[in-house]
UniProtKB/Swiss-Prot annotation:
The protein's name: Large ribosomal subunit protein bL21
Top-level taxon of the source organism: Bacteria
Self-association state and partner proteins as the record states: Part of the 50S ribosomal subunit. Contacts protein L20.
Protein purpose: This protein binds to 23S rRNA in the presence of protein L20.
Organism (species): Limosilactobacillus fermentum (strain NBRC 3956 / LMG 18251)
One GO CC annotation: ribonucleoprotein complex
Xref: Pfam families: Ribosomal_L21p
Family: Belongs to the bacterial ribosomal protein bL21 family.
Annotated gene: rplU
HAMAP family, A to Z: Ribosomal_bL21 (MF_01363)
Length: 102
C-alpha cells in the first residue's frame, strides 16, 4: 500500500517504512507527525481524493532536523568592481513513515 501526501507545497509518494526528506516541520527528533493531506491511496483498494481523501492520514516519526548543502549565488557587474556573494542552506526534516491509515 502506498499514498501520495502533500506537505510543504510538494507531493510525495510514500510507503510504510520509507524515509523521506520534507520541508522543515516544527517538531523535534523522535516526535510523531501526522499528514492529513492525502491526495491518493493505492493498493488493493484505490482511493482518489477531491482534492483530499476523507478519513485518510499518514503517520510518521521525525528522525532528524538538518540543512542541505550550501548553494552559492554570485552576482557581478563587469567593469564596475561590484560583486555580491551569497550562500543559502535550506532546512529539511527527515521523516520515517510508520503507517498509512485509509
Amino acid at each position: 500500500m502506498y499514498a501520495i501526501i502533500v506537505t510543504g507545497g510538494k507531493q510525495y509518494k510514500v510507503e510504510a517504512g520509507q524515509a523521506i526528506y520534507v520541508e522543515k516541520l516544527d517538531a523535534q527528533a523522535g516526535d510523531k507527525v501526522t499528514f492529513d493531506k492525502v491526495v491518493f491511496v493505492g493498493g488493493d483498494d484505490t482511493k482518489i481524493g477531491t482534492p483530499f481523501v476523507d478519513g485518510a492520514s499518514v503517520e510518521g516519526t521525525v528522525d532528524k532536523q538538518g540543512k542541505e548543502k550550501k548553494v552559492v549565488t554570485f552576482k557581478y557587474k563587469p567593469k564596475k568592481h561590484t560583486h555580491t556573494k551569497q550562500g543559502h542552506r535550506q532546512p529539511y526534516t527527515k521523516v520515517t513513515i510508520d503507517a498509512i491509515n485509509a
